[in-house]
Amino acid sequence: MLDSVASTLQLSELLSLTKAEQSIRLAEINVELEMLSAQERVAWALQNLEGAHAVSSSFGIQAAVMLHLLSKQQADIPVILTDTGYLFPETYQFIDELTKSLNLNLKVYRANESANWQEARYGKLWEQGIEGIEKYNKLNKVEPMRRALNELNVKTWFSGLRREQSQSRAGLPILSIQNGVFKFLPVVDWSNKDVHYYLKEHGLSYHPLWEQGYLSVGDTHTTQKWEPGMSEEETRFFGLKRECGLHEEDNEQDGSGI
């Protein structure tokens, strides 16, 4: 089946096409990728998508799935974490545990200004409505990730986004181009049940806060515990938005934007 999917893709060649031409080319490949297992998709991507590869992780509730899936096929793949300085203590502990147990090649990136310095300059941005949250995300998520991809010369970026996580992710393809790099989502069609079975099969753990009722975990000040009647996306950013900015197109063409 893998042989039926297109051979090595040259990023520069695809970027020379119009958006419409890119969409047609990628759509043909995605039809084939949808028929493969997550493990087969990863194997195909590592073999056929040119350039350096990396996986981003927030070390959230189900993070162990992608980290295990990728590191088992490429042990030294860089794992990019953008550390805001406001993660839960349990998240930092989870990072240490997974880094040790999976022998991860962890690469930590942070904002140019420390958390305290940002508060001194801008106040608590997360309390300043959607504009404040977007500025906070740009400083602490988008710019550090942009820097990581540039410094590591990443051409293929793996992520664990899944369609059922939110309405904004419902139509995501497995393979796309985002701001000049390949974006590859091998578990995009997985359900929560699929995730659970994978974790159980491989002896992996959920984030520690899962047991306390958290469905999604980010920063302490913009993460809420799930309550009856809430959707998963309503547990983040006060329900104002789902994405932190990392997975949104910013229309840059040089591959630096996230």
Curated annotation (Swiss-Prot):
Chief location bin: cytoplasm
Pfam families from the UniProt entry: PAPS_reduct (PF01507)
Pathway assignment: Sulfur metabolism; hydrogen sulfide biosynthesis; sulfite from sulfate: step 3/3
One example of a Gene Ontology biological process annotation: hydrogen sulfide biosynthetic process
Annotated transmembrane regions: none
EC annotation from Swiss-Prot or TrEMBL: 1.8.4.8
GO cellular component, one term: cytoplasm
Catalytic activity as recorded in UniProt: [thioredoxin]-disulfide + sulfite + adenosine 3',5'-bisphosphate + 2 H(+) = [thioredoxin]-dithiol + 3'-phosphoadenylyl sulfate
Function: Catalyzes the formation of sulfite from phosphoadenosine 5'-phosphosulfate (PAPS) using thioredoxin as an electron donor.
Protein name: Phosphoadenosine 5'-phosphosulfate reductase
